Amino acid sequence: MDLKKCLDMAEAAKAGQLPEISDLEELACLPEQHVLDLLPAANAVRKHFFGDQVHLCCIVNGKSGKCREDCAFCAQSAYAKTSAPVYPLIDSEKMFQGASYARENGVHRYSLVASGGRLPKAEVRMVAEAFSRMGGDGVGYCASLGILDAQDFALLKEAGVDRYHHNLETAESHFKEICTTHAYGDRVKTIREAKKAGMSVCAGGLFGIGESDLQVLELGLALRDLEVDSVPVNFLIPIKGTRLEKSSDLSPLRCLKIISLLRFALGGKEIVICGGRESNLEELHPLVFYAGASGIMTGDYLTAPGRNPQKDHAMIRRLGLTALREGE
């Protein structure tokens, strides 16, 4: 695919016309040596929908370890042999500290993440009660508590949590290679229930877990069909003791191609680069915005250290971009 065709696709995307599947498949199969040719077009689409504003989010690991699911990549799975921390649901004071950290560091959105297939209803109520006392003041609230039902979502929404995070993780055709203790359809149902409850949905996946380039596209199209609002893109950090500890499917250029492909497939949806940004993209990680990303996760990840928010703010300023604030 030549640069002119990419730019023509970008102009069509800006007008709300998503590319033909055959064109997206051609992008998915593009050799790595041509990936940088995608960036001007992908960046044009990002800039059309988001201007120079960048979405920043951060998370706190609200409950860690002893998860009964067997996700091949996860350090918190009971099936893994790792040194990941194990602790119960944190108290409300620690939840408040996470929100304060976001506010003090100019972060647009704060999310509480809990391990496990689903958080017990009593603990969902505890989380909702804590969020109800946080107040807004420039930060939007998100939760990632597993496979919940309509009653849970109504409780969270009433407490001021306006977005729910629940990844599909990978393409449906690859899902059973990654997880066998629950079904892909369970994740889809959760996303639909959250949307039905009137919540914004953040749903994406993890890359570098054995998926093909066409399966990257398959996931992107599934997310498009579900009409999710924000798509977190994670790149595998192989963790010793997990089934994917020796996985090495990623290069900096492949990461950029994945971002660009998703931008073309998803049009004006948020694309937020999360786990594995620095370790996989290395010196190229500031290029995520030019590849089509509209945001990044800053601060620490669930079980791995991340990047200082002030470093990310400095990078954003050097790129001529600005950090988004809640309400803008």
From Swiss-Prot:
Pfam families: BATS, Radical_SAM. This is Biotin synthase. The gene is bioB. Residues 50-277 form the Radical SAM core domain. Catalyzes the conversion of dethiobiotin (DTB) to biotin by the insertion of a sulfur atom into dethiobiotin via a radical-based mechanism. InterPro entries: Aldolase_TIM (IPR013785), BATS_dom (IPR010722), Biotin_synth/BioAB (IPR002684), Biotin_synthase (IPR024177), Elp3/MiaA/NifB-like_rSAM (IPR006638), rSAM (IPR007197). Signal peptide: none annotated. It catalyses: (4R,5S)-dethiobiotin + (sulfur carrier)-SH + 2 reduced [2Fe-2S]-[ferredoxin] + 2 S-adenosyl-L-methionine = (sulfur carrier)-H + biotin + 2 5'-deoxyadenosine + 2 L-methionine + 2 oxidized [2Fe-2S]-[ferredoxin]. Keywords: 2Fe-2S, 4Fe-4S, Biotin biosynthesis, Iron, Iron-sulfur, Metal-binding, S-adenosyl-L-methionine, Transferase.
